């Protein structure tokens, strides 16, 4: 499994090199007199870039969850007396706009660090520039495996969520146990995100009797995936792996039902939202879906009396009332922000390098993550903060966790 990961990481690195080239710049983002910009005795300025508009605008609620958590920390006095100012800009899920935002945040806003910038292609477009400026690009909102593997060339970049190769391994392990001769049809987004998960899955099933028998890709600019779904449904697949973002995830669920395609349907974590995907598609059409989870589902009655989820919902209501408390993306943002605060608390001095040292050496529990899942890093070579997930199945009106937490190896 480890050799398969190494091979795929080499391919992924080659893929993103072209994206990264457009983000290169020689401007120096360092402050004067040896001090780092964006941090004072009473404030810390962070920057982020998100798709507030465009085909992935459903992810806007990630920023809302993060803002709510930072506001709740500020209300209690901040981090060591420093209030957090989180400046978030819209990139419409377009890499060139992400590049513009990164330059603005670093050169004009003078942020201390970039936090949770969203999207595989967008982060790939800016990471050469950001690392050249020696500005932390931490806890990016993308599960591309590259963020945790290329620490030598990009020491200021880290992921947060379980990477897509880990997720693909979990699906492969599930099928190997539950459907060991599965014939799989795959719908995937035609970019680094989709290819990372798809190729990770192909590597993970090597040596098994599981076979990928059909593949169809879509562009983020496509209006629908109807034609792709028709082609996949005409294959001899008995399993459907749906690698998509929320808009297209919902479309695929509807299309499968319309086509009468009754196969095991696995939908990737980023499109598994009951609120944003399953409800628009129809809960009746979503029965039996398989996915993964690593944080608590705010819509599940399982966590109705959970202290961490109560704190989350109260904080969201107080500081981001426009956000939906049952949106899992809000929990994602809240949890990532909680991790960021722990990293800031762990700094031995108020510098960017001290932040990275803290980020690379963590062992902490974030209360909104699932029991048994922690944020752990163990040195400068460790770029995978969360390395565990749990299989879940949609039954009735909610996701139901299955089995035990599955931990990956890197």
Language-model regions, residue ranges each:
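Extracytoplasmic ligand/sensor domains, especially the bilobed periplasmic-binding protein
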Residues: 110-215, 265-291
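Beta-alpha junction/loop-to-helix N-cap segments that form part of ligand/metal-binding clefts
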Residues: 26-34, 58-64, 76-149, 160, ...
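C-terminal motif of bacterial Sec signal peptides marking the signal peptidase cleavage site
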Residues: 18-21
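Signal peptide-proximal N-terminal region
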Residues: 41-46, 64-86, 206-209
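Hydrophobic alpha-helical segments within soluble ligand-binding/sensing domains
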Residues: 98, 159-183, 224-226, 249, ...
């Amino acid at each position: 499994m480890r050799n398969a990961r190494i091979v795929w990481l080499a391919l992924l690195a080659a893929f993103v090199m072209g994206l990264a080239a457009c983000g290169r710049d020689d401007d120096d983002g360092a402050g004067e007199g040896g001090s780092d910009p964006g941090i004072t005795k009473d404030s810390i300025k962070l920057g982020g870039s998100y798709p507030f508009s465009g085909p992935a605008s459903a992810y806007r609620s990630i920023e809302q969850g993060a803002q709510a958590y930072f506001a709740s920390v500020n209300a209690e006095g901040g981090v060591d007396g420093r209030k957090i100012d989180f400046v978030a800009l819209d990139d419409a899920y377009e890499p060139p706009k992400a590049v513009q935002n990164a330059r603005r945040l670093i050169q004009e806003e003078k942020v201390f660090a970039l936090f949770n910038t969203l999207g595989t292609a967008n982060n790939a477009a800016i990471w050469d520039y950001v690392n050249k400026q020696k500005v932390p690009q931490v806890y990016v909102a993308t599960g591309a495996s590259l963020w945790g593997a290329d620490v030598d060339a990009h020491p200021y970049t880290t992921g947060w969520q379980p990477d897509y190769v880990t997720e693909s391994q979990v699906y492969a392990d599930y099928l190997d146990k539950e459907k060991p001769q599965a014939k799989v049809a795959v719908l995937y987004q035609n970019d680094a995100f989709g290819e990372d998960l798809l190729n990770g899955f192909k590597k993970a099933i090597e040596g098994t009797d599981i076979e990928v028998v059909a593949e169809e890709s879509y562009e983020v600019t496509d209006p629908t995936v109807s034609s792709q779904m028709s082609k996949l449904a005409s294959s001899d697949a008995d399993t459907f792996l749906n690698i998509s973002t929320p808009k297209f995830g919902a479309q695929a669920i509807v299309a499968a039902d319309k086509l009468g395609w009754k196969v095991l349907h696995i939908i990737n974590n980023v499109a598994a939202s009951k609120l944003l995907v399953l409800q628009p598609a129809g809960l009746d059409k979503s029965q039996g879906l398989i996915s993964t989870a690593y944080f608590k589902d705010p819509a599940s009655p399982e966590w109705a009396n959970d202290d961490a989820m109560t704190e989350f919902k109260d904080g969201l209501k107080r500081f981001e009332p426009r956000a939906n408390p049952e949106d899992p993306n809000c929990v994602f943002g809240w949890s990532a922000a909680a991790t960021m605060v722990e990293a800031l608390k762990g700094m031995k001095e108020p510098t960017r390098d001290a932040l990275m040292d803290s980020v690379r050496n963590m062992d902490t529990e974030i209360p909104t993550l699932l029991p048994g899942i922690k944020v752990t890093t163990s040195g400068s070579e460790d770029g995978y903060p969360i390395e565990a997930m749990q299989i879940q199945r949609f039954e009735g009106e909610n996701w139901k966790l299955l089995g035990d937490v599955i931990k990956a190896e890197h």
